[in-house]
């Protein structure tokens, strides 16, 4: 080979080598490639989305009362054998699916397993094992959004979408890089909580009484002076952490019976008593033969038992249907219906934005022009339907001296860090329905029902 060719080859090799060196220098000094390389070796795991809690009227939490645990699992750590006993059925199935994975993952475990050498993170457990006011509060869907009850109605307030994240430097096999530790990055903002009118202690006590005394039903406890609901219980209950099991369960446990409409019956009779006292008909007396006949239709008292000569007090104590039918005829349909409407019958109650109780059925004036329909209406039968919330509002009006206070369940949003009140979510509303003297007489009459009449089982 001639010297000129050797020189040309040598020059070409030198030029190529120089190009490679320049390229390597450029790559080393380019931070964008470094960032990409680091990102390819980082695993980011998202913890459950942050969500504001519900609090009672004194600031005590109603949700988030306990915590659950997430175990951080890396390939090659023996997670399957170590964590299997500490996972529920779904977690055990996931361990099996992920046994040959090449990426880290978070696993729900029943307790803190850091003693096994596994990194473990505490997260709030939304609902307690014995949940509070579950039908009122509701439950979440699989994405952490409210699906029912106040959880759904106030989802825009409670859900932020912000999540804490775990950043793990991993190898190509998904294992934690030697000398590194996972970094927990907190969400930028904390969610707002919501303060309810409920009292946690009263709610818990009411749920205990309900569990001992009924399989199906509800309990409402209202602050007489304000209309604020201190307890709202509906049975049967359900597990808000496992709603699927309750979808087909007997007794419709997802139904909030306090907000659902039912046939009313004799608890409607105080409405007629109030109308009678306001109209000056409180001294009406009737001889009860155990029934009342109207246009060939017989309306019987319970067991067709004659009550004899009864006034308003005896008719309430004995729950005399015939007395109230005749009292209603004396008053007229318009007066009785007007009193019922003023006490909240036939109108739904806004619990929160997007959550409303049933309106029930208050028969139209034209319907009550029919004597048979009006007779049934006078002792709480016929087309009349009402919610326990409406009945509780009526009874509270009697206790509050004739003033109707709209029942309230929600108070305001709160700062979860300081407890400071932020934005009011409801406003109280009151109106006088009947005179204070009427309310005092009704209180006396209803006390007699408990002491001497059909309500003796309600005596303290």
Describe the role of every protein-language-model region.
Residues 1-244, 337-342, 458-459:
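Periplasmic/cell-envelope proteins involved in peptidoglycan metabolism and beta-lactam response
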Residues 61-63, 181, 223-266, 271-460:
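Beta-lactam-recognizing serine transpeptidase/beta-lactamase-like catalytic domain environment
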